[in-house]
């Protein structure tokens, strides 16, 4: 059973995802998957929350989207987004956040650099591993073509990984929360 504080953390990070969804998307001419800031929220939730809370914050966000809340960039929402080219990327959010949290909890010493590499592995590579095949399937293109198109996202995602690592450390230090990644367990 979740404690009240866990529910509050889940709500805060669900709201953060919604706020990041109001940032205008950047569409590229060669792919229907927009560049957004929401993976920053996935990485932050995973870096700051316990694994279960990190997962649930992203799941609640996706449920709100599925039920029609226009929380994705460009005001998108509704069940149909889970049948579009972004579906695999979206579905990866809860698992990526959970994996980031698990990995962060296992770090002996949490540093910006270690968290940055954790974000690369689980916040970028893992999300791509789920998102690219689904995108290829939905768009009826080769997997290699979808992977090549996704290379355009890598520089921005690396910046988001670095920013979220830095912010996670600073936020956690500022709040000195006892139930963050710095406390093992959960």
Curated annotation (Swiss-Prot):
Localization (cell): Cell membrane
Q: Which keywords annotate this record?
A: Cell membrane, Membrane, Transmembrane, Transmembrane helix, Transport
Q: Which Pfam families match?
A: BioY
Tell me what induces its expression.
Answer: Repressed by presence of biotin, under control of BirA. Probably part of the bioY-yhfST operon.
Which segment of the chain is annotated as a signal peptide? none
Q: Which GO terms describe its molecular function?
A: biotin transmembrane transporter activity
| Ranges that cross the membrane | 10-30, 54-74, 80-100, 119-139, 149-169
- Show the InterPro entries listed in the entry: BioY (IPR003784)
Record's bilayer topology term:
Multi-pass membrane protein
One GO cellular component, as annotated: plasma membrane
In terms of superkingdom, the source organism counts as Bacteria
UniProt family annotation:
Belongs to the BioY family.
Functional note: Probable biotin transporter.
Fetch the PANTHER family from UniProt.
Answer: BIOTIN TRANSPORTER BIOY (PTHR34295), BIOTIN TRANSPORTER BIOY-RELATED (PTHR34295:SF4)
State what protein this is by name.
Answer: Probable biotin transporter BioY
